[in-house]
């Protein structure tokens, strides 16, 4: 039998063995047995040395064709088996898309965040900036630049979590007044900003107090700002949050960083201003503190109080939420009880 005949026989036998392979291991074994260094094709090619010079290149070229054809057949069979394995796995792990899916619970903004978002949207529409500041604050900004020097008796009104003698957990969002006033360029226009955030007090948690709660600081500084501007702004805020039927009343009060200072009341939710046990028969409920910015606060921030003035106010979203929805215990907002919180969502 000539070498060409032997190669033809190996070619036919090899193709048959490749086709009979049932897994990738079989394919690899056939490859080694046919094309390996000790395989029959290699053995046949060793006999080429006995051929004459004219026949040798022809047989060599034919042998390479056989080798290439077997290699292509091995590659094709390997791909067929790999696809078969993949298809079997996909069939086994198939998902029936006609079955109803498991619903994923959708989150909703917390009721207090809803109040904050409503306040932000209102003041953004009025041209205010919304700024945020650090919760770990310097004594300088939290107290001193708010007209509360060391040993000032008004500091006792705000029991404070101190980290060091000069670093504390802010007791109010008012420090953003000082931080913003320091940087503002009044040649570019007036300063109008609100600053929502979390504040901390060393209070014992009870139905109306929490050691951690929210505030929204408001500040407007420009020439010729008056108390009428403050009252008008608070009236708009009350109408936005509670409705047009609620009126605003200002009462004299004291805050170190404003002069004059006022407590702001709105019409009682329960009786509509007629007087009841909720409002202690006054027809009004206190909701926030405000006032005209104290000249000392302006001076310490490098602003001339003879040229510029303005007003500031501090809103408590937690208290607003309690009043708006008739919640009698502030702690309920922080217990993560979905049954309670869902009342204040679209789903509730």
Curated annotation (Swiss-Prot):
The keyword Electron transport does not apply. The keyword Amino-acid biosynthesis does not apply. It holds the Pfam family Phe_tRNA-synt_N. Mg(2+) binds at residue 259. This is Phenylalanine--tRNA ligase alpha subunit. The gene is pheS. Keywords: Aminoacyl-tRNA synthetase, ATP-binding, Cytoplasm, Ligase, Magnesium, Metal-binding, Nucleotide-binding, Protein biosynthesis. It catalyses: tRNA(Phe) + L-phenylalanine + ATP = L-phenylalanyl-tRNA(Phe) + AMP + diphosphate + H(+). GO terms for molecular function: ATP binding; catalytic activity, acting on a protein; magnesium ion binding; phenylalanine-tRNA ligase activity; transferase activity; tRNA binding.
